[in-house]
């Protein structure tokens, strides 16, 4: 499993691959082509504090890429009952394709 926490964790080759993919995706949008790179993928979004812009940007991005985003607030999860965010994320990672904290 590859975690993307910061750019410094990536090799130069991985950074170039990300930039190439971003350029391809941008070109698809410009040309009006279908670009469902995340079709069938589900992202769990864990929020300890509400963030409207972050939630909307991730939900919109997942939708545009053909995937689904699930919003999980602290009060709707074990986080609201004192469980560490890392434990909740570990359990959720067994059922989801990606987790955004």
Where do the model's predicted regions map?
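Positively charged, low-complexity intrinsically disordered leader regions
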Residues: 1-56, 60
């Amino acid at each position: 499993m590859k975690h993307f926490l910061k750019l410094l964790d990536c090799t130069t080759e991985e950074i170039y691959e990300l930039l190439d993919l971003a350029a391809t995706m941008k070109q698809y949008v410009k040309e009006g082509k279908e670009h469902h790179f995340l079709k069938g993928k589900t992202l769990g979004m864990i929020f300890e504090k509400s963030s409207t812009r972050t939630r909307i940007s991730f939900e919109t991005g997942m939708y545009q890429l053909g995937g689904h985003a699930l919003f999980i607030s602290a009060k709707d999860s074990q986080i609201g009952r004192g469980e560490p965010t890392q434990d909740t994320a570990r359990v959720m990672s067994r059922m989801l394709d990606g987790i955004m904290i």
